Amino acid sequence: MLDDIPITIQKSKKIKTLSLNITPSLEVILKMPDSCPQARASAFLKEQEAWLKKTLLAMQEKYSLLHSRLNTYKDKILVFDEVKNANDYTLTDLKKILKTYLERKLPLIAQKMQTSYTHFSVRNNAKVLGSCSYHNRLSFALLLICAQKEAIDYVIIHELAHTIHKNHSQNFWRCVKTFCPNYRALREHLKQKVVFYTQLLKQLQP
């Protein structure tokens, strides 16, 4: 649809509006309703072309910096934001370390927030840093092991807030802010680091 940019198209009856996303791997995805005419989709892409090219360029520059930083971390890993020798750890080891931390912190923070959860798990290839199911089952991404403990605690608070508010309403964010006043800075920090952490973990054996 755009001559110089490959685009993956996802069509579904569940999709209600046209949207354009760029994944961390720089894949451009156009989501469109089944009923959307091709001409409308093409016009939408033309409208978004300038933004798309500018954003892709910025992300490519960011990736270039990322690769240069990864070179300085060859055979290194971060454990709670501390540099360690990657050869001393497997993914299983890191999972146990993060799980132990969560087993200690989750009940403490849940008690402070006057809420509860039914179960929690740590996932190796999670697409999100954390999630909370309708039945209050919590899930956390293994890559959080690389982050500072304060940032991990923010994710814990974020997911526990979902046991109270099943959305991202003003009440939800008010709840998060009550227990994590600097959540915005921590959220932005994690957003900037997530790809870096993911790449760091790729050098480890299961």
Task: Give the residues covered by each predicted segment.
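Walker B catalytic acidic pair
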Residues: 159
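Active-site-proximal or metal-binding-adjacent scaffold patches in catalytic folds
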Residues: 1-154, 163-206
